[in-house]
Amino acid sequence: MMTLGTHVVLLAAAIGLTGVRADAQHLLVPMDDGQQNHLKAYGLTYTALKAGIKAEWLLNYRGGAFLLPDTPELRRRAGLDGITAQPTDAGAVAAIRAEIAGANMDAIPLEKAPRVAVYTPPDAPPWDDAVTLALKYAGIDYVPIYDEEVQRGDLSKYDWLHLHHEDFTGQLNKFHLGYRDTPWFIDLVQKNAATARKLGYPNIPALKKAVAEQIRQFVERGGMLFAMCGATETLELAIAGAGVDIAGSFADGTPTDDNADAKLNWKRSMAFQDAHLEQSPFVNAMSDIDGHQVNVPGRRQPLGAFTLFNFSAKFDPVAAMLVQNQRSVIADFYGVTTSFNKTALKPGATVLAFEEGAPWVKYIHGDYGKGTWTYYGGHDPEDPQHAIGNPPTDLSLHKGSPGYRLILNNVLFPAAKKKPLKT
């Protein structure tokens, strides 16, 4: 015969709540292998912050767990989304804090849901961008913006900006090499050219450089930038190449400046320096920043795996936040820009993830002005050989994706109450 207590236990198991206690004061959301849905756990934490409920990020504790107040609304959300959330009383929380105090761990307060913008074309399907896939799946609000919104100054409305595979040199990733006669590419060129004319620019490269400058200023003023894939490399080239013709004639009607390399001003860039442009219109690469050169026969490098650095949670909490994960080694994945050659990094760049023995790194972070930038190479962590026309990644099949977790770490990072470095 089933008792009321039996019903309570079965209900708790069904909705992802473990160890239900009537006197619980907190919900512990583990992020190690005990979590049923890592990606939606970020959305649960974001939901709390959006409702004005403060949370804590327990760095290096159980894979970067979250500690939330125990409310009926959060319990319900955890249950509906299949998120493992453990009701935890004051004594258990005290024990967790004692463990954190004596180890390479820390509890970081999360205070306010960040205002999130994603730079993406108005008609782009969400599977074009791993970040929009992650945000939608996790249930995190974002506002799509594009060139017109950037040019009218809308970036000031947001705390966090994401860029994906946009080519800020205006060469449309040199897709003309293989797709010039395809309807989608013809449409892409026409729409970008029309926007350039509408905003008063002579061509697409001029428009994209102007947008890149607005993004640079956004970071300089205190904004937080997260970029993936080709946007990482081309944003830096566009910023360093201000006032220099770095686009081929196929893009703007004039040849690239023969002395473009020498004229690049790397003092203006955020992450990279001393890179060399790929000026041939017949080579599908932008520069030598990318280590893998996926679209260049003879240069393409095989995929390996990358390792996350284990940072001090107490002394370097920002870097520690960005690498919270249940895995320390993650399978690599291609993108227009897959990795970043070490020789191109500025001295102030912090390497967050690297491939053992390789001349490139995968994941980097740094400060610029009053803001920060974070670059993550590759297109889709669960589609390593990504090609145009691939079906969208179904994140319900990758609920614990370590590669996607790195994306969502970046979304919650702006919510953290900053602590001064203990130097």
Segments predicted by a language model, with ranges:
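Helical hinge/lid and interdomain linker segments adjacent to catalytic or ligand-binding clefts
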Residues: L27, D32, Q36, A65-R76, ...
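Catalytic beta-strand/loop cores that center a nucleophilic Ser/Cys/Thr
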Residues: D129, K136, E233, V244, ...
